[in-house]
């Protein structure tokens, strides 16, 4: 599919806005619930800063994940989906990790093929 106007998301939003909105709400609810659980566990494990606002961070994460799929902002010719995901996760994690979390992240990055 080339361009946003031919994408299934665009077509759904244009022709079936109520269904699109309901699907987006379900996606948001599912994803933020999962992210909140992960953030809470990360704080408990002292990998994420205890001062983070878990609700806010989960919403920012969702918004970023939706945003990196915008082909107008991130053309596929310039940004591969894998590169976008990797860069976004690195950006997100560096904003919330503790010193111990950073050590773990750095060791993961070094061992990644």
Residues covered by each model-derived region:
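Phosphate/oxyanion-binding loops and surfaces in catalytic or ligand/nucleic-acid-binding neighborhoods
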Residues: 1-4, 26, 30, 64-71, ...
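Short secondary-structure transition hinges
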Residues: 2-36, 40-52, 56
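C-terminal alpha-helix
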Residues: 38, 91-95
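Hydrophobic/aromatic-rich alpha-helical bundle segments in the mid-to-C-terminal region
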Residues: 43, 47-90, 99-113
């Amino acid at each position: 599919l080339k361009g946003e106007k031919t994408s299934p998301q665009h077509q759904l939003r244009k022709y079936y806005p109520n269904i699109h909105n309901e699907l987006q709400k379900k996606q948001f609810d599912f994803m933020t619930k999962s992210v909140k659980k992960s953030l809470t566990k990360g704080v408990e494990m002292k990998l994420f800063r205890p001062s983070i606002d878990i609700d806010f961070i989960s919403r920012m994460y969702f918004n970023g994940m939706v945003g990196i799929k915008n082909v107008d902002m991130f053309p596929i010719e310039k940004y591969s989906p894998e590169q976008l995901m990797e860069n976004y996760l690195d950006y997100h994690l560096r904003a919330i990790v503790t010193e111990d979390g950073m050590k773990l992240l750095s060791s993961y990055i070094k061992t990644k093929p």
